[in-house]
Amino acid sequence: VGWGWKETADAGLDIVSYTGNGSNPRNISHNLSAIPHWILIMDRDQGVDRFNYHQAIGNTHTLLLNATNPKIDSDVWNDTTPTSSVFTLGTNDVNANNVKYMAYVWTEKKGFSKFGSYKGNGNIDGPMIYTGFRPAWIMIRNTGATENWVLFDAKRDVFNEMSAILRADSAAAEGNQPDSYAIDFLSNGFKIREDDGKINSSNVEYVFMCFAESPFVNSNGLPVNAR
């Protein structure tokens, strides 16, 4: 299965290409006209670590999309929260001289996308997370332990409980263990149905990125028409 995102401020995505200059801190402009909630930066020349800013873990930490490390205390974001016009780089990990980078910059759009967090309860009756829409695609990450990034979508798994996962940090084939990491896609969010560490360890913070299949409300907060 393939996924794609169209760059448009209306959908909350700006793609920014820049060349590092080795001078930190450095501000990089974006065109969202809104505060970013998720930023992914990739080195286009060397293909090394892929750094994530997520609003739930803040500007003092990062997560690596290509690795299973827990969140890292880092100066990558210069301990500076992004604004509606710029995000700030703090180290040569994302601003090495003459290295080309690509930054994917997202902001939440009501009824279309949600970038949040939840706390696991270690129970098969796990937390329910409100998004305001039925998900089409969800990526979840345990921030406090060595675990995979796990992706669920409504194309490979069409009925609840959903347990077919791909791992963003691994080239391994699809996993499917309904007794370990199942979730339900709901009309207004998703519910955790198992207690595996990838999605639901007790008292652990998880971050998620979620995009809509069917909005529960439109961008103005009004209920949408039934299909």
For the regions a protein language model found, what residue spans apply to each?
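Surface-exposed molecular-recognition determinants
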Residues: 1-227
